[in-house]
Amino acid sequence: MSFIQSQDPAIWDAIQAETTRQQDGLEMIASENYTSPAIMEAVGSILTNKYAEGYPGRRYYGGCEHVDVVETIAIDRAKELFGAEAANVQPHSGSQANAAVYLSCLEVGDTVLGLDLAQGGHLTHGMKLNMSGRLYNFVNYGVDKVNHRLDFDQIVKLAREHKPKLIVAGASAYPREIPHDRFKEIADEVGAKLMVDMAHYAGLVAAKIHNSPVPYADYVTTTTHKTLRGPRSGLIMCKEEHLKLVNRNVFPGTQGGPLMHVVAGKAICFAEAMTEEYAHYGQAVVDNAKTLADTLLSCGLRLVSGGTDNHLMLVDVTAVDLGGKKAEAVLDACGITVNMNMIPFDQRKPMDPSGIRIGTPALTTRGMGGDEMKRIGQWIYNALSDSDNAALHESIRTEIREMVQAFPVPAAAESPATVA
């Protein structure tokens, strides 16, 4: 019997229900994935008991000799994986990583260029309610009105006009590969530093499917889950000359003690991402996304930018007379989990936008391929085009339950928290 089951039945029941949801359905939120059993074991290890404020060899607590080894391994592996000069593995999240970089190179009120949240950016790229938009003068760039790809004519114009101290590249809902070299050219022209937030596509960079921002950017931030398949956490990489300020603005600037059990999980994640198996995985993620996108297009759905280069796509569900909120609910009834999402130049409200965001990282981790993507694409179209047909939705849900039996969720069977 699990310790959780015997000690806290209410939490146990919730974990069991979530396990069933993950196993019986299709997880297609682009930012979600499954970690390996080794990473889950590390995150649940005895390292969670240890406080370790400071950095390896320079701690404010005793007894850190073993966690120093863990953190040093994580740093070295991050640098090797991405070819970075320096790395900080302590950020608790991607947002914390971004905040630390901002503190390292900006003063309150400084001007920054970042992608508009409504056109694919992230909250930390200048959203007015976020700390980034409250502390700094963010000027937003966007995408072209016709092809929905980054509008570099606009980016150049804004950079020349506003002379930002920092340019932020990266996105949370942009289905195309980002040309980091182009951003570097613009940053150099106007004398700005360049930060790339590759949280969504870091795994594709690690697998050498997408171009790396590391040679071009002063700072690179990322989460370690999503396409990297690690624990939920963050990472900063930078030029060696920036490391001292980055370290200072992670600790003590924005955080206290690091989560050493999560740092261990990150170290394992970085090692996994250097394997040949992982390179195949990265390619499969992109191949699956393109197959799914092609299927949806052939059914008559509209995709932002006409398709995808990476792990995600944005579907304009107004083509089937739906809003994103109902589309999300309809697919959820079928056992397909996605999220409603704004699309470029959206005329609807953020809480009921025109689109949904769909991703393939989690399903690819489960071992699904092109044949499954074609079936899933057809299910998505059938459900959305007959959105009030509860019987159809239940039928799709049954078919999905049957299909996924051949694709178990990694780590679920090994975790004591999911075994009665």
From Swiss-Prot:
This is Serine hydroxymethyltransferase. (6S)-5,6,7,8-tetrahydrofolate binds at residues 117, 121-123. Transmembrane segments: none annotated. The keyword Amino-acid biosynthesis applies. One of its GO terms (cellular component) is cytosol. PANTHER family: SERINE HYDROXYMETHYLTRANSFERASE, SERINE HYDROXYMETHYLTRANSFERASE 1. InterPro entries: PyrdxlP-dep_Trfase (IPR015424), PyrdxlP-dep_Trfase_major (IPR015421), PyrdxlP-dep_Trfase_small (IPR015422), Ser_HO-MeTrfase (IPR001085), Ser_HO-MeTrfase-like (IPR049943), Ser_HO-MeTrfase_PLP_BS (IPR019798), SHMT-like_dom (IPR039429). The keyword Metal-binding does not apply. Homodimer. The gene is glyA. Keywords: Amino-acid biosynthesis, Cytoplasm, One-carbon metabolism, Pyridoxal phosphate, Transferase. The modification N6-(pyridoxal phosphate)lysine is found at residue 226.
